[in-house]
Amino acid sequence: MPPAKMSIRDLNFYYGDFQALKNINIDIPDKKVTAFIGPSGCGKSTLLRTFNRMYDLYPGMRAEGNINLDGKNILGKDIDVNLLRAQVGMVFQKPTPFPMSIYDNVAFGVRLYEKLSKAEMDNRVEWALKKAALWLEVKDKLRASGLSLSGGQQQRLCIARGVATKPEVLLLDEPTSALDPISTGAIEELITDLKNDYTIAIVTHNMQQAARVSDYTAYMYLGDMVEMGETDQIFTNPAQKATEDYITGRYG
């Protein structure tokens, strides 16, 4: 496995008294795509949300253990959570463009963390839209509302917004589940391109998608990390019978 960008050690997570993650120990390799699969409620999305402490926004939730990003524990009390979320961007299941222009959607996060001149911001917005393979479709209507775009375009706009702050890690929580097959294909191609510059973690219910886009796959069940390995190995020769049962559809 390549060097780890994130190392998760002895991670437990609680919603109030309910333990949603149980003693998770995995490495997320740098500039690779790691997919998390498993049945609904297994903890995939919860785990993803610990990587940028999204749970801090909600009372009664807590994480214990260590999540090391480049060797620094992001669960520490001294961490600037806003800066962390600039380093670890996130794209959600349904497209979530803000009710503002395409340009302002992309610039929104940048304005929170950087002071750029108009020319610098113009360049950053163009750069991010190109990264998200959306520039050619919107370059002549940057002042139009982000809500005017199609579903697939809106999700790519959210990816552009996510990369505009120049994060090191990009989290994708079922990013194509609300999209049609053509838009899904475009996002999958984009993920393959983006891993040259970013460490990517993706949650997906679609095992075929995990097989297509990821380098490593982790199978979770009821808050436990059952198995993680290279995607080809997980899908063709898993070490755990529980993984094989899920992959082959015998689960449940």
Swiss-Prot record:
Main location: membrane
GO biological process: phosphate ion transmembrane transport
Signal peptide span: none
CC annotations in GO: plasma membrane
Domain of life, source organism: Bacteria
Domain ABC transporter, residue spans: 6-247
The enzyme's E.C. designation: 7.3.2.1
CDD domains: ABC_PstB_phosphate_transporter
Membrane topology classification: Peripheral membrane protein
Keywords (A to Z) from UniProt: ATP-binding, Cell inner membrane, Cell membrane, Membrane, Nucleotide-binding, Phosphate transport, Translocase, Transport
Annotated transmembrane regions: none
Compartments it resides in: Cell inner membrane
Catalytic activity reported: phosphate(out) + ATP + H2O = ADP + 2 phosphate(in) + H(+)
The keyword Magnesium is assigned to this record: no
Annotated coiled-coil segments of the chain: none
GO molecular function (one): ATP hydrolysis activity
Residues engaged in binding ATP: 38-45
Physiological role: Part of the ABC transporter complex PstSACB involved in phosphate import. Responsible for energy coupling to the transport system.
Family the entry assigns: Belongs to the ABC transporter superfamily. Phosphate importer (TC 3.A.1.7) family.
Subunit structure, interactors included: The complex is composed of two ATP-binding proteins (PstB), two transmembrane proteins (PstC and PstA) and a solute-binding protein (PstS).
Name of the protein in question: Phosphate import ATP-binding protein PstB
Gene: pstB
